[in-house]
A protein has these predicted regions:
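Metal-associated gating/positioning segment near the N- to mid-region
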Residues: 56-118
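A short helix->loop->beta-strand "cap" motif at the edges of active sites that frequently abuts
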Residues: 48, 92, 179-180
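N-terminal metal-binding scaffold of metallo-dependent hydrolase/deaminase domains
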Residues: 1-44
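Divalent metal-coordination and catalytic microenvironments
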Residues: 9, 24, 30, 55, ...
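Active-site metal-binding motif and surrounding structural segment of the metallo-beta-lactamase
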Residues: 40-58
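Hydrophobic/aromatic beta-strand patches that form the interior of the parallel beta-sheet core
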Residues: 6, 49-51, 63, 96, ...
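Histidine/acidic-residue-rich, glycine-tolerant segments that coordinate divalent metal ions
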Residues: 101-112, 117-186
Length: 186
């Protein structure tokens, strides 16, 4: 790959407090070499070609926080490879997947499978959630500590809400004790 130069872009990077018009230089290995208003036609070697973005945006990768993926169980609809190709084409570099799969993501063996498949097949970062309750039934809590130790980033029952207030209270206490993220649909 040859070095690439981009100019006249709206660059937005909240992490680095950048919100300006400028350019971007990407080296031969795909690594960003320079970014910002100092990158313009004045500092691009005359023999090099550049891409004028004419005000289009350059941003860090987008994270989709609520993705229902078909894997496992509904691969005929979508799998990690097709999901990641579609999202990557739109600038999404990371997704948080919901536990509404078949089987439901509610135990460590499914989490192991999911993380392995995501690592092997996806071209983007996959961050799985597990269900709050076993089999998404709203009656028995999943093992937050074990699931979190396996790499689950949060817990949700997807589109379902917990109707049992005692159970929800137990869930919130456990989440607090373990510093777990709870994503509840309302």
């Amino acid at each position: 790959m040859k070095k690439k130069y981009f100019i006249n872009a709206n660059i937005i990077d909240p992490h680095n407090s950048i919100d300006e018009v400028g350019g971007l230089i990407v080296d031969e290995n795909g690594i960003i070499e320079a970014v910002g208003k100092k990158v313009n036609t004045n500092n691009i070697p005359s023999r090099e070609k550049y891409i004028d973005l004419k005000g289009k945006h350059i941003i860090p990768g987008i994270v989709d926080m609520k993705v229902f993926v078909g894997e496992p169980g509904y691969e005929y609809k979508e799998n990690f490879r097709t999901l990641s190709e579609a999202w990557l084409s739109g600038g999404v570099t990371s997704v948080v997947t919901m536990p509404n799969t078949n089987p439901i993501i509610d135990n460590v063996s499914i989490v192991d499978f999911l993380k392995r498949r995501g690592r092997d097949k996806a071209k983007i970062n996959i961050y799985p959630t597990a269900s709050l309750t076993k089999n998404l039934e709203g009656t028995n809590m999943t093992e937050f500590g074990l699931l979190q130790a396996k790499g689950i980033i949060g817990f949700t029952d997807g589109y379902k809400t917990i109707q049992n207030t005692r159970l929800m209270s137990r869930i919130m206490r456990s989440a607090y004790d373990l510093n777990c993220l709870i994503m509840q649909n309302v």
